[in-house]
Swiss-Prot record:
Residues 57-158 form the CMP domain. Keywords: Chromatin regulator, Chromosomal rearrangement, Developmental protein, DNA-binding, Homeobox, Isopeptide bond, Nucleus, Phosphoprotein, Repeat, Repressor, Transcription, Transcription regulation, Ubl conjugation. SUPFAM superfamilies: Homeodomain-like (SSF46689), lambda repressor-like DNA-binding domains (SSF47413). InterPro entries: CUT_dom, CUTL, HD, Homeodomain-like_sf, Lambda_DNA-bd_dom_sf, SATB1/SATB2, SATB_CUTL_sf, SATB_ULD_sf. Residues 161-234 form the CUTL domain. Sumoylated by PIAS1. Sumoylation promotes nuclear localization, but represses transcription factor activity. This is DNA-binding protein SATB2. PROSITE patterns: CMP, CUT, CUTL, HOMEOBOX_2.
Length: 733
């Protein structure tokens, strides 16, 4: 039997509640936190308790009843409060309880331990796990048509901390919240070495991309490890504090006065921007320490054990307040996405360790726009000098404005590069702009100097000859063109039919880059003439797709042949390898009549050094690129995903297989030597790596099989590209 103090209409459907004049709005103590979490009073409800009818937007109102489950019989099922919560439609249905509690102002630990029961009208309530077993079901899929008769009952457990929760009660949500707390102290690679979960699984769980819930056995194993970890951490803190404060007459310098500590705690509780609500037992212990620890000396009458306990507790409270004050200065919606640190793009020759801590500002997009206006530079120039990509990709990044805290590794690498560039002095940035303009006006000079320049400027614009796509206008009149969202599927089907890459299709169809086409197919925005840029680009693609199939195949073939010839001309014009190019030309087997140049005396037999020159041109990692890769390993780990490898390859102007071999070698040294391979101020050539120095698939553990498979696929793609390019180069020579 449910015991409630409100009107019986609360037990019925929200329709009955909306018609009752006795039902009041939510408690005033929760109003500030609700508005802070994006639930304004006007959208949440009316004075008589009725819910707004319009749900055509991004939110769905859900009536929540929060119940506290205590151990005593008297308050065995005590209701805390009941009110409406606006929930985004794209939230996973399995995360409905956690999202609702966070919107109501509860802590992450409380949300992780809560259980949800859903009630539809007068039907019997069911646990959320019984409603659907689809891991990717969203709130809109389940509640879009019945939200007005749904009541979500949330039962809170009595455990105040995650480490107090029994291992048998750990579930997917509990593991996710525990990981978020741990990732505030360490990065993913370090955590993966200590906990039972792999790094890829940790990243997927925290980013909510791991749709299949973790098994109950794995959750219980993680819960047991978490309790041991917390216990060991507390003991270590006690030992450190005991060694520091063993002299009773000496007051710790970093430990504040308890009066100041209490005032800081009150200030932190009243902070409107703080998203962390500490549990009640920790807050109540602040005034309890005042009679024990005075502003002067510690009382010598206390037992050593009690002194250690009080010092450890004060240290923990100090850490809690420091974390809360840090989070109070961040964006209000930065709830739990501060766990990923990604590499900066240093400009110095030697990598600076301090650059690895550069964080991406939430207003990075506005900073970029302000910089474009201040320096009067185009997006193409800024994209080239800031993160060495194309104007199309920068335009897509500025248009999407994804939150850096929830972005992918690839986007974060680009944002880090832009942030690092904007942190340079204004005079230095202007000088870089001027150098880029000069290189653009003198492409031949930039092509010769590209061999000795840094990776940030090595991908300079080259002299572009006429391509087969010059007759295709970039902008077309789309007034009479019928374009729908189905064009995205047509693009993918065309690439599969013709067996062409995204880069090739983007070049011939819209004169764009592969990154731009990748973003286009990722977002699949609804085509509309109001979005002029998107509409014109899609019109160009539509015009290309309307060509006969044989004409499109001819264009693909011509562009592919032109690409290989342009690449060969670039290799011939590079000065560091004239002997190598001559050797390759003279060593080609002839199928027809011998040309006159073969009458020259044969070249000397190739040595090991001359044979190794060719791979070194594309396998040598400079000092600056080495600093970027080492920073990536330090902040992200040894297992970058495919998108991050693609971004690093484009940013450092290195082939993907070179970057993959570098990471494989580093993993080999970590596995067999317990540390990363040190490079003492010298460049690295992955061609010098021996086969036994690359971590093979048999030596990878289960958590790393996915990454190794991806590396093999990338290497095979690179080898396939080289084998395809060889016949074309032979014909050209």
């Amino acid at each position: 039997m449910e015991r409630r103090s409100e009107s019986p209409c609360l037990r019925d459907s929200p329709d009955r509640r909306s018609g009752s004049p006795d039902v009041k709005g939510p408690p005033p103590v929760k109003v500030a936190r609700l508005e802070q979490n994006g639930s304004p009073m006007g959208a949440r409800g009316r004075p008589n308790g009725a819910v707004a009818k319009a749900v055509g937007g991004l939110m769905i109102p859900v009536f929540c009843v929060v119940e506290q489950l205590d151990g005593s019989l008297e308050y065995d099922n005590r209701e805390e409060h009941a009110e409406f919560v606006l929930v985004r439609k794209d939230v996973l249905f399995s995360q409905l309880v956690e999202t609702a509690l966070l919107a109501l102002g509860y802590s992450h630990s409380s949300a992780a331990q809560a259980q949800g029961i859903i009630k539809l009208g007068r039907w019997n309530p069911l646990p959320l796990s019984y409603v659907t077993d689809a891991p990717d079901a969203t709130v809109a899929d389940m509640l879009q048509d019945v939200y007005h008769v749904v009541t979500l009952k949330i039962q809170l457990q009595s455990c105040s901390k995650l480490e107090d929760l029994p291992a048998e009660q750990w579930n997917h949500a509990t593991v996710r919240n525990a990981l978020k707390e741990l990732l505030k102290e360490m990065n993913q690679s370090t955590l993966a070495k200590e906990c039972p979960l792999s790094q890829s699984m940790i990243s997927s769980i925290v980013n909510s991309t791991y749709y299949a819930n973790v098994s109950a056995t794995k959750c219980q194993e993680f819960g047991r490890w978490y309790k041991k970890y917390k216990k060991i951490k507390v003991e270590r803190v006690e030992r450190e504090n005991l060694s520091d404060y063993c002299v009773l007459g000496q007051r710790p310098m970093h430990l504040p006065n308890m009066n100041q500590l209490a005032s800081l705690g009150k200030t932190n509780e009243q902070s409107p921007h703080s998203q962390i609500h500490h549990s009640t037992p920790i807050r109540n212990q602040v005034p309890a320490l005042q009679p024990i620890m005075s502003p002067g000396l510690l009382s010598p009458q206390l037992s050593p054990q009690l002194v250690r306990q009080q010092i450890a507790m004060a240290h923990l409270i100090n850490q809690q307040i420091a974390v809360s004050r840090l989070l109070a200065h961040q964006h209000p919606q930065a709830i739990n996405q501060q766990f990923l640190n990604h590499p900066p793009i240093p400009r110095a020759v030697k990598p600076e360790p301090t650059n690895s801590s550069v964080e991406v500002s939430p207003d990075i997009y506005q900073q970029v726009r302000d910089e474009l206006k201040r320096a009067s530079v185009s997006q193409a120039v800024f994209a080239r000098v800031a993160f060495n990509r194309t104007q199309g990709l920068l335009s897509e990044i500025l248009r999407k404005e994804e939150d850096p805290r929830t972005a992918s590794q690839s986007l974060l690498v680009n944002l880090r590069a832009m942030q690092n560039f904007l942190n340079l002095p204004e005079v230095e940035r202007d000088r870089i702009y001027q150098d880029e303009r000069e290189r653009s006006m003198n492409p031949n000079v930039s092509m010769v100097s590209s061999a000795s320049s840094s990776p940030s400027s090595s991908r300079t614009p080259q002299a572009k000859t006429s391509t087969p796509t010059t007759d295709l206008p970039i902008k077309v009149d789309g007034a009479n063109v019928n374009i729908t969202a189905a064009i995205y599927d047509e693009i993918q089907q065309e690439m599969k039919r013709a067996k062409v890459s995204q880069a090739l299709f983007a070049k011939v169809a819209a004169n764009k880059s592969q990154g731009w086409l990748c973003e286009l197919l990722r977002w699949k925005e609804n085509p509309s003439p109001e979005n002029r840029t998107l509409w014109e680009n899609l019109c160009t693609i539509r015009r290309f797709l309307n060509l006969p199939q044989h004409e499109r195949d001819v264009i693909y073939e011509e562009e592919s042949r032109h690409h290989h010839s342009e690449r060969m001309q670039h290799v011939v014009q590079l000065p560091p390898e004239p002997v190598q190019v001559l050797h390759r030309q003279q060593s080609q087997p002839t199928k027809e009549s011998s040309p006159p140049r073969e009458e020259a005396p044969p070249p000397p037999p190739p040595t090991e050094d001359s044979c190794a020159k060719k791979p070194r041109s594309r396998t040598k990692i400079s000092l600056e690129a080495l600093g970027i890769l080492q920073s990536f390993i330090h902040d992200v780990g040894l297992y970058p995903d495919q998108e991050a490898i693609h971004t690093l390859s484009a940013q450092l102007d290195l082939p993907k297989h070179t970057i993959i071999k570098f990471f494989q070698n580093q993993r080999y040294h970590v596995k067999h030597h317990g540390k990363l391979k040190e490079h003492l101020g010298s460049a690295v050539d992955v061609a010098e790596y021996k086969d036994e120095e690359l971590l093979t698939e048999s030596e990878e553990n289960d958590s790393e099989e996915g990454s190794e498979e991806m590396y093999k696929v990338e290497a095979e793609e690179e080898n396939a590209d080289k084998s395809k390019a060889a016949p074309a180069e032979t014909d050209q020579r």
